[in-house]
A protein has these predicted regions:
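Extracytoplasmic ligand/sensor domains, especially the bilobed periplasmic-binding protein
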Residues: 1-90, 140-174
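Aromatic-lined carbohydrate-recognition surfaces of secreted/lumenal glycan-active proteins
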Residues: 115, 138-141
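Extracellular/periplasmic ligand-binding modules, especially the Venus flytrap/periplasmic-binding
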Residues: 121-124, 173-186
């Protein structure tokens, strides 16, 4: 709509790389896209493996079926291949699903070293609840923002949130040390 009307659209949160790869004249992003975030996630994995002297050799992707989840999964798959990890699963589900039992059973059966979920808040809670019920405990969970960075995530998920690692465009810990950072984020 903004493109047709010739009105600049400043996007503060959508992270799909496709949005800036379409050649739109009036679309502007003020934060990194999933390609940049995912690169940093995999840089973190490289460092983590060195520091902890562990080896990650396999991964599974779990994502909801919107542009966010699909584009995120596509980007993650590229990095998995580039890093020579074995992709064991790439599982898509409807974000409004009322059950993730079959998806979690597949993840549990494959037992990948790394789980990369891309989910919104409600499906993040559904995944965690289902994983607990089915005793699925991924060795490492590295999430793509959204549901895992919802302000209520830790308080709502409680102990089930422990061990989840996520990327975020904003860091509250940094804001405590750099007072003006919160103003910039607003």
């Amino acid at each position: 709509v903004a493109e047709r009307a010739g009105i600049p659209f400043v996007n503060g949160s959508s992270s799909s790389p496709a949005l800036t790869e379409r050649g739109l004249k009036y679309f502007f992003r003020v934060s990194p896209h999933d390609g940049q975030f995912t690169k940093l996630m995999f840089d973190f994995l490289d460092e983590f493996q060195k520091k902890k002297n562990i080896k990650i050799s396999s991964a599974s992707i779990l994502h909801e079926d919107s542009a966010f989840g699909t584009d995120s999964a596509t980007t993650q798959e590229k990095f998995i291949n580039d890093k020579k990890y074995k992709l064991l699963n790439k599982i898509t589900y409807n974000a409004k699903a009322t059950s993730l039992s079959s998806e979690v059973q597949k993840l549990k059966a494959s037992n990948a070293d790394l789980l990369l979920p891309s989910s919104y808040t409600a499906d993040t809670y559904l995944f965690l609840k289902t994983a607990k019920e089915l005793d699925y405990n991924p060795k490492m969970l590295l999430a793509q923002n959204a549901g895992y960075t919802d302000p209520a995530f830790v308080s709502t998920a409680g102990k089930d949130a422990e061990g989840a690692i996520t990327r975020s465009p904003y860091n509250d810990d940094l804001a405590k040390r750099i007072p003006n950072l919160s103003k910039v984020n607003e």
